[in-house]
């Protein structure tokens, strides 16, 4: 199995990417990795070349670049070359912690959209209080969605949750303003009716306030709603941890309490740590394309590689394609 990784993407590239790749190579004996980027920078952190290949390029896509234009014009950019490795059949999947918009463009224009899928979806795995997490899609790939798009998201998310996350008969919920039938705008009502007859375990509407409680294993929404929900959850978590730290450091007594509580607080932090859940998968493409978090450290990159490997090994893309052929809803 071979995975191509954009070694120039992300806030901590290439160091985090190289260290994460070497960790994955040690963990998985069947894995081969191609690091795409400036060779000099990669070799600075590469202590072992076992099953690791470097594809040199000086060009990269910057966060300030217009995504579509950059992908079309910067043919030798590290992200584009990683996607090209997949298109050419040299790699089974690709990963980047670079620009989300550019990776979506590279996925569409280089890797290509899966037959029968109208719009790809960006899907991270979000943490829950029980540590199990849930898959949410879409969180920004397609802000103006149609009912058929959300129907396909539900099916793709269900396949992923079962194959990669090992959840038998995963619960699929529709993000809405209330849990009762008939709630929401016209899009939500139409999607609800479609999902009731879908080949999935649809549990109905779910509200954003209940997401962290693990009310569903897969949460479906349009890209605009999903992006707002995602950033609200991230912001709330950061604010809570910041306030907690401020209070625990406010006096000598509270500092003593913090020392006693530290093991429990670390458990809580680990439960809510996005780095353990891998990256956000771009569903609806011909091969796995994973968007790692922009601030990924080496552990986050390792988790994204582990996630990608599972998608390839468990044949997630062929399974989604097979299910869609059996359910050609238009």
Swiss-Prot record:
Species whose genome carries this gene: Bacillus mycoides (strain KBAB4) (Bacillus weihenstephanensis)
MF annotations from Gene Ontology: phosphate:acyl-[acyl carrier protein] acyltransferase activity
Entry protein name: Phosphate acyltransferase
Superkingdom to which the source organism belongs: Bacteria
Keywords, comma-separated and alphabetical: Cytoplasm, Lipid biosynthesis, Lipid metabolism, Phospholipid biosynthesis, Phospholipid metabolism, Transferase
Pathway membership, UniProt: Lipid metabolism; phospholipid metabolism
Broad class of where this protein is predominantly found: cytoplasm
Function: Catalyzes the reversible formation of acyl-phosphate (acyl-PO(4)) from acyl-[acyl-carrier-protein] (acyl-ACP). This enzyme utilizes acyl-ACP as fatty acyl donor, but not acyl-CoA.
Top enzyme category: transferase
Catalytic activity entry: a fatty acyl-[ACP] + phosphate = an acyl phosphate + holo-[ACP]
